[in-house]
Amino acid sequence: MRPSVWAAVAAGLWVLCTVIAAAPRRCLLSHYRSLEPRTLAAAKALRDRYEEEALSWGQRNCSFRPRRDPPRPSSCARLRHVARGIADAQAVLSGLHRSELLPGAGPILELLAAAGRDVAACLELARPGSSRKVPGAQKRRHKPRRADSPRCRKASVVFNLLRLLTWELRLAAHSGPCL
């Protein structure tokens, strides 16, 4: 082959690679509409284990307040809510000691890592300003809450893990990207 042909092929490959690399990431959450049963069973087992542990604490100085309902599905707030829940769950589960982890906790951590990356990609695609609040809407002021102990915080995140995986992540997958 002549040098000009090689140059043309090289230029074509360079353009192709540049276009592929510059292509925006897609927001793909549809595969979280139904999760692998083994992962859900591991999340249930972890929750049950922590429930038994919490009952053995004696004095109940943890207040497991019910969570507010997640934001409406038409807003980017749901994706941000799910992203915060995933980050909390990853932090707590990766900080557990070996004795506290169940054998099936590995798939939970893998699922959380993948879901965290996918939700972050969806949030990156959101146009700036699309999730702004309605002008004039006032934020309710809440009394400052007493901070929970690390043990209570860990138990709360573990108790809410199943809800995060089976309800909140699924709703985010059904609602699609926020644009």
UniProtKB/Swiss-Prot annotation:
Name the domain of life: Eukaryota
What family classification does the UniProt entry report for this protein? Belongs to the lambda interferon family.
Chain positions covered by the region annotation Disordered: 130-149
Organism per entry: Homo sapiens
Q: Which InterPro entries match?
A: IFN-lambda_sf, INF_lambda
Q: What is this protein called?
A: Interferon lambda-4
Q: Name one Pfam family in it.
A: IL28A
**MF terms per GO, please?**
cytokine activity; signaling receptor binding
Q: What induces it?
A: Up-regulated by polyinosinic:polycytidylic acid (polyI:C) which mimics the double-stranded hepatitis C virus.
Keyword line: Antiviral defense, Cytokine, Cytoplasm, Secreted, Signal
Q: Does the keyword Glycoprotein apply?
A: no
One GO BP on record is: innate immune response
Q: Look up the record and report any one GO term of the cellular component aspect.
A: extracellular space
Question: Where in the cell is the protein located?
Answer: Cytoplasm; Secreted
Signal peptide as annotated in the record: 1-21
Primary location class: cytoplasm
Q: Keyword check for Cytoplasm, yes or no.
A: yes
Role noted for this protein: Cytokine that may trigger an antiviral response activating the JAK-STAT pathway and up-regulating specifically some interferon-stimulated genes.
